[in-house]
């Protein structure tokens, strides 16, 4: 683990030296972090990570933020916290993963969550928005409210009911 921590620290020092967060645009700095594998060190190489232990993220963050770098989770909370792991695990191909993860990591693409609904609020068991398959697509019917960062978001994680016959706590799918 010490060797891995030294590797992460070395990469982080290189990023802040070559892309001083106090003088370069945020997107450039975060792009350099992604390219170095420091966005999520536990993600696979080539997807913003190094394939290392999640605990080593603290090593990278201390150096990057100590040099004045931004806290990405604060800039794109749904992107970093929920969308990135979902994309990593469920996107259809490596190309799709790369096309979504890098702009998410740089905050060029902000993500939001589409969960809360009128009449149900944040009670997901009361969710009424439906998703019905239609050929190779899904038809979504319903509405969402209180969508933080929707005004900045390019992408959203939508929660919809896909099985109306299931109990109210089941039959939900994220799109």
Task: Name every feature range the model reports, one short phrase each.
Residues 70-85, 105-114, 144-156:
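FAD-binding core of FAD-dependent oxidoreductases
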Residues 1-78, 94-99, 103:
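Amphipathic, small/basic residue-rich leader segments at the start of a protein or domain
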Residues 129-132:
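A structural signal for short hydrophobic beta-strand segments in well-ordered beta-sheet cores
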Residues 141-175:
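A short core secondary-structure module
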Residues 67-71, 86-117, 135-136:
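FAD-binding glycine-rich core of flavoenzymes that anchor FAD
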Residues 61, 84-87, 101, 157:
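Conserved protein kinase catalytic domain
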Residues 119-127:
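Active-site-adjacent elements of ketosynthase-type condensing enzymes
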Residues 46, 116-120, 145-146:
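Short, solvent-exposed loop/turn elements at beta->coil junctions and helix N-caps
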